[in-house]
């Protein structure tokens, strides 16, 4: 098998339908009418895109194996990191050690491997003794949860690409590309979250998938890997625009998770999180403003 991520290919293909099953028939109509297909290629880079085949007027969403591996590795790290961080807080620990626990250490090792693989050959072997995706309902609990988060994240990314087709955006870079990316983000997020009421049980899981997708992109931008430079809005802007517009309950779980992960991603960039805000929404908003100022300098 080329990569353990291959276990999830079937689930990846069905994820845009399963993320919002109440709109499954509407999506099927779009996919059939626009002749949208998904293909997976082996190449380096986070180069997920849609291209048109003029000969049969079909639209092909292209996913790279390396990008799928990175998104899964990030989903796994996001889950493990936030769980261990929560335990550390409950224990009133003064310090949080990324290398102190094997569970977190292995997740961190996998994420670093996935980033390096993404930026080099794109076809390196999955590291042994690290977490990995398994067939459905197999593997460790962490692996299963990571795969669920991953599938929600990739569903939003696929809906983003489908939105380009639906909105009839030119599939080339133009002066309007950044605005078109904002429109595709908004269309995808509205498709997934738009018809849910605030207390709907599905809302948190879907919002977590969207948050994971944009935080994953942010993790690459922090490392100066500008895979989407000059064509997409900055990742911090996408976090704000796609998370803040849909309240996900009074406990603000998604905002809290985003704040914790951003705090980790920017821990070496002289950004201090103001934890005295009146809510996690305000704390996250202040943090994103600080990130904006940092990245614009």
Swiss-Prot record:
Q: Which InterPro entries match?
A: Peptidase_U49_Lit_pept
A GO cellular-component term linked to this record: plasma membrane
- Which sequence ranges form a coiled-coil region, renumbered to this chain? none
Which GO molecular function terms does the record list? peptidase activity
Query: Where is the protein situated, by its record's location annotation?
Result: Cell membrane
Keywords on this record? Cell membrane, Hydrolase, Membrane, Protease, Transmembrane, Transmembrane helix
- Primary residence: membrane
Q: One Pfam annotation, family name?
A: Peptidase_U49
Span-the-membrane segments of this chain are 61-82, 149-178
Q: Indicate how the chain sits in the lipid bilayer.
A: Multi-pass membrane protein
What domain of life does the UniProt record list for this protein's source? Answer: Bacteria
Q: Which processes are annotated in GO (biological process)? A: proteolysis; regulation of translational elongation
> Which protein family is it in?
Belongs to the peptidase U49 family.
Outline what the protein does: Interacts with a short DNA sequence about one-quarter of the way into the major capsid protein gene 23 of T4; general translation inhibition occurs when this late gene of the virus is expressed.
What protein is this chain from? Cell death peptidase
Q: Tell me the classification of the organism that encodes this protein.
A: Bacteria, Pseudomonadati, Pseudomonadota, Gammaproteobacteria, Enterobacterales
Which gene is the coding source of this polypeptide chain?
lit
């Amino acid at each position: 098998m080329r990569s353990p991520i291959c276990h999830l290919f079937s689930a990846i293909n069905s994820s845009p339908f399963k993320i919002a099953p109440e709109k499954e028939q509407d999506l099927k109509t779009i996919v059939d009418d626009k002749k949208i297909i998904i293909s997976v290629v082996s190449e380096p880079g986070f180069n997920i895109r849609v291209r048109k085949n003029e000969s049969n007027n079909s639209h092909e969403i292209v996913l790279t194996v390396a990008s799928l591996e990175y998104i899964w590795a990030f989903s796994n790290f996001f889950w493990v990191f936030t769980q261990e961080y929560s335990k550390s807080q409950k224990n009133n620990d003064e310090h949080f050690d990324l290398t102190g626990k094997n569970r977190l250490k292995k997740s961190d090792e996998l994420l670093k491997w996935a980033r390096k693989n993404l930026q080099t050959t794109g076809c390196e072997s999955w590291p042994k003794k690290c977490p990995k995706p398994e067939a459905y309902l197999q593997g460790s609990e962490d692996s299963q949860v990571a795969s669920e988060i991953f599938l929600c994240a990739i569903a939003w990314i696929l809906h983003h690409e489908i939105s380009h087709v639906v909105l009839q955006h030119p599939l080339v870079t133009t002066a309007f590309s950044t605005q078109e990316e904002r429109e595709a983000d908004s269309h995808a997020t509205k498709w997934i979250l738009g018809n849910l009421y605030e207390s709907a049980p599905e809302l948190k899981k879907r919002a977590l998938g969207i948050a994971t997708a944009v935080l994953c992109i942010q993790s690459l931008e922090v490392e100066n890997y500008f895979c989407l430079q000059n064509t997409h809005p900055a990742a911090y802007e996408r976090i704000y625009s796609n998370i803040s517009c849909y309240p996900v309950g009074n406990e603000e779980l998604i905002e809290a998770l985003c704040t914790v992960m951003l705090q980790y991603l920017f821990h070496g960039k002289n950004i201090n999180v103001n934890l005295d805000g009146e809510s996690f929404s305000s704390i996250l908003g202040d943090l994103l403003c600080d990130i904006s100022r940092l990245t614009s300098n």
